[in-house]
């Protein structure tokens, strides 16, 4: 049976979950937090940070997406998952997709463009585990 991971993320939090058992239960294996993803732009700007085309918040969000993608790329190389499901709001989903390594991107089986990172594990299962699998 292939190992499936779920990534439920937004600009301030990313949870990596593994699908286990015949009931397809989710087990959280990693929780990344990016407190800067929720900060106000003024809190991130310093005199040493000149104005650029991207805002400080956008820059921090991009760095966070890259951190998640590096983690996923390393996990793929180690053979920790076979299939990957990405769940994130559209803008952050685009960042994840853009930064994902080519071989890891081939493992993406599904993308859900919703912000579900804040849901508890059992609620999240309702969105990402197929109904047929839950009814077994």
Which residues are covered by each model-predicted region?
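Terminal alpha-helical anchor/extension segments at protein ends
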Residues: 1-136
